[in-house]
UniProtKB/Swiss-Prot annotation:
Subunit note: Homotrimer.
EC annotation from Swiss-Prot or TrEMBL: 2.3.1.117
UniProt: substrate binding residues: R104, D141
GO CC terms in record: cytoplasm
Compartmental location: Cytoplasm
SUPFAM superfamilies to which the protein is assigned, alphabetical: Trimeric LpxA-like enzymes
This protein's name: 2,3,4,5-tetrahydropyridine-2,6-dicarboxylate N-succinyltransferase
NCBIfam families noted in UniProt: dapD (TIGR00965), PRK11830.1 (NF008808)
Pathway entry: Amino-acid biosynthesis; L-lysine biosynthesis via DAP pathway; LL-2,6-diaminopimelate from (S)-tetrahydrodipicolinate (succinylase route): step 1/3
Gene that specifies this protein: dapD
Amino acid sequence: MQQLQTVIENAFERRAEITPANTDSITREAVSQVIALLDSGALRVAEKINGEWVTHQWLKKAVLLSFRINDNRLMEGAETRFYDKVPMKFADYDEARFQREGFRVVPPASVRQGAFIARNTVLMPSYVNIGAYVDEGTMVDTWATVGSCAQIGKNVHLSGGVGIGGVLEPLQANPTIIEDNCFIGARSEVVEGVIVEEGSVISMGVFIGQSTKIYDRETGEVHYGRVPAGSVVVSGNLPSKRGDYSLYCAVIVKKVDAKTLGKVGINELLRTID
């Protein structure tokens, strides 16, 4: 694995010179191998080690290099054709392969090669980009988008129209992470490497980036880039220092533990926030 990483790191340093026509066989094979390992879930761009999320930057670099070394090509789809550098994950799947993998894909859901989809996952008509990791028991609902290299935990519900930001456009240092047992409400956006910690509930229409204030109304504490575990979050506003205008923020209205989350429905948590 170290040899593979070295090839990727060296190629990335000279990425401006690389084209599909001049890519050497060693670099091409290394990038292809990494994409295949990401696709199978054997590798992932970020993982939790000793309680902390660690981003493997060299894997992200391999994803970026894949765009440098590959030409656009014609790809056949069910209703139309595509023209892109990255093949679709399910292009060569047959019924037996889908049964072995153990997830459902509802048309016209699109998943790029290099994204991992775990067992018991349901993909409604949605989009999952290259390098993403979607863990077991997760629902990606209609028109939801899982961005490049984003990490989605077990038993997560991404509601209709949710946007989980990627790392490629614009280029981000770390992927956006949704930990296990989270609920992300319809049309919400979580981007720029924000981490939503385990068991959190994000209401409909909440937008969280690195500069978004995440205000805990119980403690008065303000978080940036991280939603603490077990938070129930709605959209809100905070007054300016002068008090003559207010700016958007996300508000933690309550905290719940796993036991409460298991007993109480999501709708009840969001309806009783006063």
